[in-house]
UniProtKB/Swiss-Prot annotation:
Sorted UniProt keywords: Aminopeptidase, Cytoplasm, Hydrolase, Manganese, Metal-binding, Protease
UniProt xrefs under NCBIfam families: PRK00913.1-4
Recorded superkingdom: Bacteria
Active-site residues, record numbering mapped to chain: K286, R360
Subcellular location, record wording: Cytoplasm
Name of the coding gene: pepA
Biological source species: Blochmanniella floridana
UniProt name for this protein: Probable cytosol aminopeptidase
Amino acid sequence: MPIKFDVTQEHIESYPNFCIVTGVFNDSYLFPSTIQIDKMSQGYISSLLKRNNFNGSINQHLLLYDAPYFFNKLILLIGCGKKNEFKSQSYNTVIHYIINFCKKSSITKILLLLSELNIDGYDNYWKIRNSITLCNNECYIFNKFKNINDVTKKNITYEIISYIDKLDNNFQYCKQAVKDGLAIAKGLNIAKNLGNMPSNYCTPNYLSNKVQELSNYNTDLDIEIINELQLKTIGMHAYLAVGSGSIYPAVMPIIKYQKNPKGPNTNPIILIGKGVTFDSGGISIKPSDKMDEMKYDMCGAAAVYAIMSIVSELQLPLNIIGILAVSENMISSKSLKPGDILTTLSGQTIEILNTDAEGRLLLCDVLTYVERYNPEIVIDIATLTGACVIALGNHYSGLMSNDNNLSNNLIFASKQTRDYIWRLPLDENFEKQLESSCADIANVGGRSGGAITAACFLKKFAHKYKWMHLDIAGSAWISKNCVKSSTGRPVELLTQFLINISKI
């Protein structure tokens, strides 16, 4: 369900066909805009609130039809709780409730009078951009493979306008929030759509072609596709081993964006996304329960693809390289086996103890490959370990890094976007779990601290630059109440991180 979003300083009378949405705090404390509407309707709202015992509790609502002396047919009053307790989470809750109520009520034109809400530490830019991404998430639906007869499942367009007071001198800043918000929302949908594609459609070839298509309509992005033969010539044997059992050859698409005003040779920021289009576990096969969800094992690559589209649209003054580590982990007579030993691009050898720990085999060779770019920062994004889901659930992505300042900056961006991350430790005690009797390193370190030992494995290949690892195994998709969908995380988080860097 697509959305159109804009801001306006025109009088609300200019939007007679829109449902006016305004708020009421606890104990019927009216917003300034609600007071204005009440006066225009000659006290109709205040008297109605008293008769209906409407006290402004959070998410309490009252939909008014044809208020007297008022030009709009619909007014939605939404409870916002106690004024002194209204926080950023309260704002998100209210927006979420409004959009869901309007969807159920078939209201498609919405005029929000909520910018006057005061939230400590958050300005109108945040409120507007956050409203856009929240509305986009609530309206998102993946129905590509459904035969649609039900009108409620069709792609209905929602038109949402946020009113900004005429006394607000930062209207252009609000317009920028719309531009940024719509670009991020579009990117989130791109990531979700890719993540939700079934693996018989979204093969390594499909992802490679999607990246190649970017150059057809975006001249700011340079595309390079490294094929299986080239990967072998380079010496990326760990990378190639992952897809050895698949009929689809491994591939490594690279997306380059160079807009740093200091020139194209300025050290780039590199994003690496794990793109296992289906992960059967290989010889160490996964349980059949929920194996269908292993189509989501390419959500890291989908996120990188989406972020590169966003930064190009926003024209961020940075040099950024996005790399999609794409393969399929299947079973055949050629598959990687437990006990095998691989020689990586770095020269380090790996003993394979579990073929279901395949993502790190892709990433370790890419982490070595990117040394040629002399990167400023490297961030890998991967649905890497079930252990991270056990540790952090579905609410937080796991962060592990070799740089404290970089980690703090990413944590700050996570608070800005409410796409939360939690930093986990990296130290030598965990590295001991990866010791091998016959190779330089084992590819797993036992059950304890699995998310951390996976990051410790990657750390051995990322010692020449500032590096962060995001384990999104718990946050990349949702699976509950018969609903399964990619979330698009951490697209907004990393986009905000890049926006923050671009302003330094």
